[in-house]
Amino acid sequence: MTLWCTVLGALLTVVGCLCLSLLLRHRRPWEPPLDKGFVPWLGHSMAFRKNMFEFLKGMRAKHGDVFTVQLGGQYFTFVMDPLSFGPIIKNTEKALDFQSYAKELVLKVFGYQSVDGDHRMIHLASTKHLMGQGLEELNQAMLDSLSLVMLGPKGSSLGASSWCEDGLFHFCYRILFKAGFLSLFGYTKDKQQDLDEADELFRKFRRFDFLFPRFVYSLLGPREWVEVSQLQRLFHQRLSVEQNLEKDGISCWLGYMLQFLREQGIASSMQDKFNFMMLWASQGNTGPTCFWVLLFLLKHQDAMKAVREEATRVMGKARLEAKKSFTFTPSALKHTPVLDSVMEESLRLCATPTLLRVVQEDYVLKMASGQEYQIRRGDKVALFPYLSVHMDPDIHPEPTAFKYDRFLNPDGTRKVDFYKSGKKIHHYSMPWGSGVSKCPGRFFALSEMKTFVLLMIMYFDFKLVDPDIPVPPIDPRRWGFGTSQPSHEVRFLYRLKPVQ
């Protein structure tokens, strides 16, 4: 009994010292401004989670371009000067680490235990199968899946041109998810069954997506924790390696990565969790992004006209083959500078990722101004490009306005020259992240979104139920989690054009 009391006392002493050191943390010389908030340990957590954008905007106004805040017992140093991003992103000294944070996150969210080399493996697989010839093959598979999802297994009657009504966000998310899921995970012999399965999986995916932000922050209620666990198990089962064996057409990209895991001796149950992670990574942002793209086009008829003219010039006349397949040449995606600018501008306005690095050893942050700051080991360095880059009026004049030609030069080529304080800036748009955390699947994601938008432009008539409805604000719960989502749905009408 005496021994246990001694051990317990020692543990309490250690924990007490740790807590005391956190509570008594103060700013040292050469460190950034420190703002711990008024609530011990929690710090600014509640304000940050309530509206990350407004919180960081207020902190920048108070402290400047570099500041450290306490969030749930952890200290985050936010850097708001994009001219100073380079050393953080390149990180040649390896003092800043991305993978340790990423491994913790995927274990918590998807149940996947990362192994040595799998981050490099994902990038190798993406380079081989999501670029060049591999990308062209996957683009064709995505086109076939979009034809199946949008026209049905029996094809669409050319006379069926009556208007249908739906929520634009739901429509885009559902179509892109189902087509993406089928393109990556393959088909059975029963196409209608495949569509029904994808539809059911989409409903579960949306529920998980709804809970996701609070899940990451550990803010779920008891029943929601149970529900999340049930959803995780469902996806592990429905995306299992065993079930995939019954399907044809699994993507070479996914097959390559699963082969690597098998060669590493990874259990099939862990491969199932890897599949869930890949489904989320590939389908969590494309549908929401396309919602914003179509909404901006509907609200800006000059942009719609420019994209239509480009689509007609590049693609020719729209036709349906055997009434159930879109006639579309995926290679044409390389020749759409206007649509490329529309996509980049939409992503500038709707993509809100947070880039995090864990400080592995005491680190000197060197700013473009020449100022240097000491960052402590164990802290996190964070970038929030939506506020510091995308909404900077010096880089992007009228930053809150949608300008479809913002990323076009007068001669119609892509614009890449942007400036801040008179200096050319490299990081002028960061919807995909940057450095080691840059999305490896961005080329395929962009291709599938462009394909969907072009199909809607060429083959469908669509309009808003209320043409005067304003663009909805971003749901504040989604700040920092990839592509933002609207605070409310927008109703629209659509119908298949009478094509031959």
Curated annotation (Swiss-Prot):
Similarity remark: Belongs to the cytochrome P450 family.
GO biological process per UniProt: bile acid biosynthetic process; positive regulation of intestinal cholesterol absorption; steroid biosynthetic process
Summary of the function given for this chain in its UniProt record: A cytochrome P450 monooxygenase involved in primary bile acid biosynthesis. Catalyzes the 12alpha-hydroxylation of 7alpha-hydroxy-4-cholesten-3-one, an intermediate metabolite in cholic acid biosynthesis. Controls biliary balance of cholic acid and chenodeoxycholic acid, ultimately regulating the intestinal absorption of dietary lipids. Mechanistically, uses molecular oxygen inserting one oxygen atom into a substrate, and reducing the second into a water molecule, with two electrons provided by NADPH via cytochrome P450 reductase (CPR; NADPH--hemoprotein reductase).
Main location: endoplasmic reticulum
Bilayer topology annotation: Single-pass membrane protein
Cross-referenced Pfam families: p450
Protein's name in the database: 7-alpha-hydroxycholest-4-en-3-one 12-alpha-hydroxylase
Pathway in which this enzyme or protein is active: Lipid metabolism; bile acid biosynthesis
Compartments where located: Endoplasmic reticulum membrane; Microsome membrane
Signal peptide residues on this chain, from the entry's feature table: none
Transmembrane segments: 4-24
Keywords: Endoplasmic reticulum, Heme, Iron, Lipid biosynthesis, Lipid metabolism, Membrane, Metal-binding, Microsome, Monooxygenase, Oxidoreductase, Phosphoprotein, Steroid biosynthesis, Transmembrane, Transmembrane helix
Residue positions binding heme: C439
Gene knockout outcome: Knockout mice are resistant to Western diet-induced hepatic steatosis due to impaired cholic acid synthesis and deficient fat absorption.
UniProt GO MF annotations: heme binding; iron ion binding; sterol 12-alpha-hydroxylase activity
Residue numbers carrying Phosphoserine: S325
Induction: By cholestyramine treatment. Induced upon starvation.
Designated gene of the protein: Cyp8b1
Tissue expression: Expressed in liver.
